[in-house]
């Protein structure tokens, strides 16, 4: 649950604990650990293609990307309902009536960073390829949203009908 091996002392304590609720208490302790949110967030961040940099040739550092990473960790550590977690990432800015006033409202806005996580080619504007760059960004977002939230691979539909799912080009 935390992505970390137990220490020898933790193993000994668990093996020696003969109470009926030993396993449940261990699970509760692991779920309450901040390491739980960090581990689960790492798995989620892989799914949504999180990176601290833009990729491509210039690979510039994204100075504020950590805010999204920390939002995801908090969401797991505070047991945020999954439907809320998804809604905030897809439309967190639309859930607000005005500027964010509370930490929870700030999180809703930070969650929409998901929409900008894909690789970004900073050289495209220099070579007058802004339209292609935007199209690639949108295609990446559609592909990632399909795989993360629908469990579907949509990238093949750019060129041909899907081999297994009822999705056409």
Residue ranges and their predicted role:
Residues 1-169:
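Short, structured secondary-structure elements
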């Amino acid at each position: 649950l935390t992505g970390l091996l137990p220490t020898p002392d933790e193993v000994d304590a668990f093996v020696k604990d003969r109470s009926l609720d030993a396993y449940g208490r261990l699970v509760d302790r692991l779920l309450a650990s901040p390491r739980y949110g960090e581990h689960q967030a790492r798995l989620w961040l892989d799914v949504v293609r999180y990176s601290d940099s833009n990729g491509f040739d210039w690979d510039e550092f994204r100075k504020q990307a950590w805010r999204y990473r920390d939002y995801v960790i908090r969401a797991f550590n505070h047991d945020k309902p999954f439907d809320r977690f998804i809604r905030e990432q897809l439309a967190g800015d639309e859930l607000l009536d005005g500027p964010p006033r509370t930490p929870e409202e700030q999180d809703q806005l930070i969650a929409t960073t998901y929409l900008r996580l894909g690789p970004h080619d900073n050289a495209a504007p220099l070579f007058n390829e802004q339209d292609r760059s935007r199209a690639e960004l949108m295609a990446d977002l559609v592909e990632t949203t399909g795989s993360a939230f629908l469990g579907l691979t949509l990238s093949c539909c750019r060129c041909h009908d899907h081999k297994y799912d009822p999705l056409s080009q």
